[in-house]
Amino acid sequence: MINTVIFDMDGVIFDTERLAHRCWLEVARQNGIEDMDKIYPSIIGCNHSRAAETLLNYYGENFPVENFLQDTRRTFNRYIDTCGVPIKPGVTELLMFLKTNGYMTALASSSDRAIVEKELKSADIYKYFDKIVCGDEITHSKPDPEIFLKAVSALKSQKRESMVIEDSYNGLQAALSAGVTAVMVPDMLPATKELIGTGVKVFPNLLSVKIALKENKIK
C-alpha cells in the first residue's frame, strides 16, 4: 500500500517546463545556435551537469555550455520575477490531502536547492514536504535512480510503499529503476504506448491522482 509520495518539481508542481523551453530557444536564437528544439526533450528532467554533458555531446567540446546555461537561467529568472511561479492545477489540493491523511512526502528535483526552496516558499507549499532532495546534492542525474532512492531513504520509507509523480521520460526511467511506483502526469511530453508498457501509471492531472489514492487504486 502506498504511504509515500515523491514529487518532481518542474512540470509537475510548477508549470515551468514550457517556460524553460521558451527561454532555451530564445537564448539559442539570440546566439545563432541551431537544433535546440530537437535536443531539448532529452534534457527535460536532468540536472545542471547532465544538461551540460548532453549539450557538449551534441554540439562539441567548444560549445560555450556554461555561458549558455547561465543565460537561460537569467532569462528564466527574469520571467519568474516579473510574473511569479506558475503553479499547476491541483497541487495544493493533493498536498493537503496527503498531509491530512498521513502520507510521507518528498520533493526530488533536478534543480539546485536554492532554486527549489525559493520557488516552493514563493508558492507557499514548502511546508508540505517532509524531505527535499535536489540536483546539486546527487552524483548521478535522472535517468539514474539515485535521487529517488535518496528520497526514499531520507523518509525511512520502503520502495514498495513509495510512488513518484513525474512528467519527463528521464524522471520516469529513474523511478522505474528505483523500484518504486511510477506515475506520469504528462506535461510537454506525451505518454507513449511503450512507456505504459513498462508499468508507468498515467493520469491526466493531479486531482485525478488524488482521487486514485483516496480510492486505493494506486498500488
Predicted features and spans:
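Active-site neighborhood of HAD-like aspartate-dependent phosphohydrolases
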Residues: 1-41
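Metal-dependent phosphoesterase signature
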Residues: 56-92, 101
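A short, Lys/Arg-enriched amphipathic alpha-helix followed by its capping loop at the start of a domain
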Residues: 26-31, 93-103
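Short helix-capping segments at alpha-helix termini
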Residues: 30-34, 60-63, 101, 124-128, ...
